[in-house]
Each structure stands twice: as structure tokens, then as C-alpha cells.
Curated annotation (Swiss-Prot):
It comes from Corynebacterium glutamicum (strain ATCC 13032 / DSM 20300 / JCM 1318 / BCRC 11384 / CCUG 27702 / LMG 3730 / NBRC 12168 / NCIMB 10025 / NRRL B-2784 / 534). The gene is nadK. GO terms for biological process: NAD metabolic process; NADP biosynthetic process. It catalyses: NAD(+) + ATP = ADP + NADP(+) + H(+). It is found in: Cytoplasm. The active site is at D55 (proton acceptor). The lineage of its organism: Bacteria, Bacillati, Actinomycetota, Actinomycetes, Mycobacteriales. This is NAD kinase. It comes from the Bacteria. Its cofactor is a divalent metal cation. Involved in the regulation of the intracellular balance of NAD and NADP, and is a key enzyme in the biosynthesis of NADP. Catalyzes specifically the phosphorylation on 2'-hydroxyl of the adenosine moiety of NAD to yield NADP.
Amino acid sequence: MAAKLLDDAGIDVRVLINDADDPIAEHSVLGRFTHVRHAADAADGAELVLVLGGDGTFLRAADMAHAVDLPVLGINLGHVGFLAEWESDSLEEALKRVIDRDYRIEDRMTLTVVVLDGGGEEIGRGWALNEVSIENLNRRGVLDATLEVDARPVASFGCDGVLISTPTGSTAYAFSAGGPVLWPELDAILVVPNNAHALFTKPLVVSPKSTVAVESNSDTSAAMAVMDGFRPIPMPPGSRVEVTRGERPVRWVRLDSSPFTDRLVSKLRLPVTGWRGPQKQAENKDPRSAG
């Protein structure tokens, strides 16, 4: 439906080969559109990346869009869909806004992730929109780690892992691990030890100018740094991960002008019964706000 509406409006729709070759897509309207094999070909001359799916789909599309500096618009087909801008039941309205260029672009902070071996040599590099999770390679046993901020040690502990997150990622894995929610307008790096066995295991909110590092203290157990849940970098015993603010943000297509607070309450279904704030009183006095 989305591709057809855009095509009817005279907009060139490009479909990656992997999507077009899907058995369902083979017998659908997707077969009509330009098929490209590489993301760079799809991005050539494009205005934005349209994502239909849940948060996992959005993160994979953001990986492609980030590489070519294109804005991303997410339409939620999943459950919570925190990263999506719009719900699927309003798809037609969202596409009309895209066709009319009635949207704005918001930059979301990213992380640069560098993995170094025990001798200080770089052995891997990547980036994350949500978070990087440092954990045991086989995901069994305890990760023996030391947390470091700006070249100074903070704490050593055994844990299931250490999460280093952006404000955008604070509502994802870091939130499930007990971290706070950071508003996306805030520039900060969030550090959340995951099930740490130590006295000091509280989440930390660190300056975006800082370098956060996690060292693996084991001489025998390998670890891995997993970015956004699907881009792993192996870490040999004794290696470390250094995380800084990314140089390039992800460009987010915004259609909705409502504040993040409303989004948080709606997506997490937070109870706000009994609220009597000034805005609520103003809404009650304005008959146009009813319904």
C-alpha cells in the first residue's frame, strides 16, 4: 500500500533486492518497482528512507540510512515501536505528509565504538544508535569488567554485561536493565551495568564529551561488543571497548509535534489518572481539545 501510494504521487520507489525477493512480495505490488541490490544504489538521489516494521527493522534501516546520511521515517507495525514516528493505522496520512514535504528533521545522537586488543591495537570499529552491549562471547558465565571514564577507573565488577547507551536507546535494552529514561534532546552518554555483582552498580549519566571504556579483565574468556542488537565485534581476552559520541547523527523524520513526554506515557502505557496540571485545566476549558 505504501509503495503504491507513493508511486501514484509520482515518487520513485526503490526496493532492496532482499525485500523484493520475499515470497510474499513476489506476488504483490512490490514487483512493479525499481529493484536495487545495494543500499548505496537505493540512496542515490533519494530524499528519505521509509521503514515499515518494529524497532528491530528500524535499527537495520537506520544502519543503511546512516551510511548515506539520509533521514529515516518509521511506521510502526510492531508492538511498542518506540523508534517509529507514526502508527500503521494512519499510514495514508503519514505518506501524504511525506509527499507534501510536510515534515521536519531531528538529529539523534549516535555512539562511535572502537575495540582494542590487550596491546592497544584497534581490531574493530562500529557505531550505534541505541546502545552497545559488552558481554561474554558465549553469553554464559560472568563478564569480569572494569568501567573507565576519561581514562580514570570507576569500578570493577562481575556482571552479565555493560550497556552504553544514547538518550534514544535509554528506552530500550538499558531501560530493561534498570537504567533511567533520558529525553532525546539531552546530550549525554548513559552507562548501565547489567546484573552486576558489586556494591556500586548504579547507572551513570556521563558527559557527551567523555570517553567511556570497558575493559575485559579475563585472560581466558572472550567477549563481544554488540551494537544495536545485531552488529557484533568479537573481543579477545584482555581487550577493551572505547565509546565516544558519534560524529554523524541519525536524521529522524518528525511528523508529530507532541512532546517526548506524551510519547513516553503512550508507548509505555504509564498511569496518569488524577493529573490536574495547568495544561490539563486549559484543555478542559477549551472545547476544541475534547476527543
